[in-house]
Amino acid sequence: MVLASGNSSSHPVSFILLGIPGLESFQLWIAFPFCATYAVAVVGNITLLHVIRIDHTLHEPMYLFLAMLAITDLVLSSSTQPKMLAIFWFHAHEIQYHACLIQVFFIHAFSSVESGVLMAMALDCYVAICFPLRHSSILTPSVVIKLGTIVMLRGLLWVSPFCFMVSRMPFCQHQAIPQSYCEHMAVLKLVCADTSISRGNGLFVAFSVAGFDMIVIGMSYVMILRAVLQLPSGEARLKAFSTRSSHICVILALYIPALFSFLTYRFGHDVPRVVHILFANLYLLIPPMLNPIIYGVRTKQIGDRVIQGCCGNIP
């Protein structure tokens, strides 16, 4: 392996992504559902963005946050899936060193952004149900833009330090990553130096971002639940629960596989590698596919516009 020398570290020219170790003979076939899922994610999210853009009645906080979620999903899935499919179908296992670090940055930064957008959507739900008459005055377009900017900057700035730290570390001769994409902890395992600070920083970022967002989401839904239970009729309560169920499904689809993958990397040494890697792939693939489907089905305005578009009645 050829090493490139820098001022303070030596790094390999490239890494080798192994894909899914243990399922090498099945990777050709695994790629087909992965490709279909990615295609649905791309088409679904682009359709969602198009519908929100052209329909001015959808220029409200909920749909603006949904547009942010769609953009994040496109970036997140596109940062891993094309390379993953190239590995499975064309055995293109090599990834350049800097491309690997860029992938690490995009995966973790936009995972943070996605979590932040879901938190902002929970706040929107809370204001809409608990303060319906003041919703438009509280969540003005400028407030929505500021929230989106804060969420974006948090993801970019919070993740940058541990990506920078990895770039300054010396790497061992071993260059194989038992994964289908570059992940922070997987890359750290190839470093020939003390990685405790970088590991600690990664833990801090993950727990501070996910912990804060989940606390805000949890508190929002506690207040929402209290408000819904005070509604006079059972039909009104059922309708309120039904309208928020899509957001809860999206939250669970992101956090369950993401937390499983994150905790398994650090503490789940007894979990089979195949199971861990499959979950690590799914958390970057399933939410981007499900989000436009869930919101397209559960949100009447979006569903109607998509149907009109399919019938040729949409500009």
From Swiss-Prot:
Disulfide bonds: C100-C192
Sorted UniProt keywords: Cell membrane, Disulfide bond, G-protein coupled receptor, Glycoprotein, Membrane, Olfaction, Receptor, Sensory transduction, Transducer, Transmembrane, Transmembrane helix
Localisation: Cell membrane
SUPFAM superfamilies: Family A G protein-coupled receptor-like
Molecular functions per Gene Ontology: G protein-coupled receptor activity; olfactory receptor activity
A GO CC term assigned to this protein in UniProt: plasma membrane
InterPro entries in UniProt: GPCR_Rhodpsn, GPCR_Rhodpsn_7TM, Olfact_rcpt, OR51/52/56-like
Topological domain ranges for the Cytoplasmic compartment: 50-57, 124-142, 221-240, 298-315
PROSITE patterns: G_PROTEIN_RECEP_F1_2
TM regions (residue ranges): 29-49, 58-78, 103-123, 143-163, 200-220, 241-261, 277-297
Membrane topology type: Multi-pass membrane protein
Extracellular side: 1-28, 79-102, 164-199, 262-276
Superkingdom of this protein's organism: Eukaryota
Ion transport among keywords: no
Glycosylated sites: N7
Family stated for the protein in its record: Belongs to the G-protein coupled receptor 1 family.
Role summary: Odorant receptor.
UniProt protein name: Olfactory receptor 52R1
Gene name tied to this protein: OR52R1
